[in-house]
């Protein structure tokens, strides 16, 4: 369960970085 939370956090950070790169 802990690794799932880590993946979720990484996904959120990656998504924010991707959106920032697109803008």
From Swiss-Prot:
Coiled coil (UniProt feature): none
One BP annotation, GO: defense response to bacterium
Pfam families: DD_K
Keywords: Amphibian defense peptide, Antibiotic, Antimicrobial, Secreted
InterPro entries, per the entry: Dermaseptin_dom
Compartment(s) of residence: Secreted
GO cellular component: extracellular region
Tissue distribution: Expressed by the skin glands.
Main location: secreted
Superkingdom per UniProt: Eukaryota
Keyword Secreted: yes
Similarity remark: Belongs to the frog skin active peptide (FSAP) family. Dermaseptin subfamily.
Described function: Possesses a potent antimicrobial activity against bacteria, fungi and protozoa. Probably acts by disturbing membrane functions with its amphipathic structure.
Protein name as catalogued: Dermaseptin III-like peptide
């Amino acid at each position: 369960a802990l690794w799932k939370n880590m993946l979720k956090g990484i996904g959120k950070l990656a998504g924010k970085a991707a959106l920032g790169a697109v803008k």
